[in-house]
């Protein structure tokens, strides 16, 4: 009997260690975890401003996704590719970066206030807001008209 409990406890420990770190449990249902942050692709068409507002309403500290490294860029690209619902509006997906802030000054930070540490621009021409382009498998940043509605990815 004692040995059976010991074996059962041992199997439980092995199962828990194989099931991961539990980081996914920190995310809301339907969100994906990556290096301490949670992400979700929304198949809703919104302007950049409306998408940012929507993200801030999802959870405390929510914003359009900020991409701080190539590793995070690859994670977001895969997440978008796997979760975007194909329509004519899926050529672009908003990210949390604007070429100019609301006061028409050049922005040097993401919508969550973090500094721009990683860049992956595809164009130099500015249309004020940035998104990921399907043609680049959602890996390159492209300038877009802020007033056009596209799908988006939130990060908390």
Swiss-Prot record:
Highest taxon of source: Eukaryota
Record-linked Pfam families: Lectin_C
Keywords from the named record: Disulfide bond, Hemostasis impairing toxin, Secreted, Signal, Toxin
Gene Ontology molecular function terms on file: toxin activity
Disulfide cysteine pairs (residue numbers): 27-38, 55-154, 129-146
Compartments (UniProt record): Secreted
SUPFAM superfamilies xref list: C-type lectin-like (SSF56436)
Cellular component GO terms, alphabetical: extracellular region
Remaining remarks: Shows greater sequence similarity to the alpha than beta subunits compared to other heterodimer snaclecs.
Entry function: Interferes with one step of hemostasis (modulation of platelet aggregation, or coagulation cascade, for example).
Similarity annotation: Belongs to the snaclec family.
Summary of subunit composition and partner proteins: Heterodimer; disulfide-linked.
Name listed for the protein in its UniProt record: Snaclec A5
Organism of this sequence: Macrovipera lebetinus
